[in-house]
Amino acid sequence: MDDLHGDLRGIIEHLDHVQNLGIDVLYMTPIFKSYSSHKYDIIDYYQIDPSFGTTEDLRELVQEAHKRGMKIVMDAVFNHTGREFFAFEDIMEKGEKSKYLDWYYIEKFPLESERGEIPNYKCFGYYGGMPKLNLKNPEVEKFFTDVACYWIKECDIDGWRMDVGDESSHYFWKN
């Protein structure tokens, strides 16, 4: 266990024990593709990080949890992304000509930030590896609404926990 975390198969294998503890809701911290250990700097919201398993593993986990009367709630990290997320990469490549420019809060060009430095764009916790999204942008809102609906339909998850809800736009959550 060098990576300091388990995986979806491990949760499936221990569901009976978890149920015997009286737990009826499992809250999953981010499990989407990311290069960090904490996974809050997501680069692909439609792919389970391979270190945790596959979409089929998540589907099986939800099915097995439901058989035991348990629910699965996933972490909705919709306030910020990783720098390697497609929209932010496009901005880094095309600068002011990027069609995703309004997806983030860019203060000036060229973008300047290595991990650990305070960047010239808004980000979560002043950490350049997690650029902050503009949730007032209808395209961003649609993207993340589609993400939320996808996982509900694809794997039958029961709900979402909204990460950084206090920093997210009320406009976004109302819609």
How would you describe each model-predicted region?
Residues 1-175:
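Active-site and adjacent substrate-binding regions of carbohydrate-active enzymes
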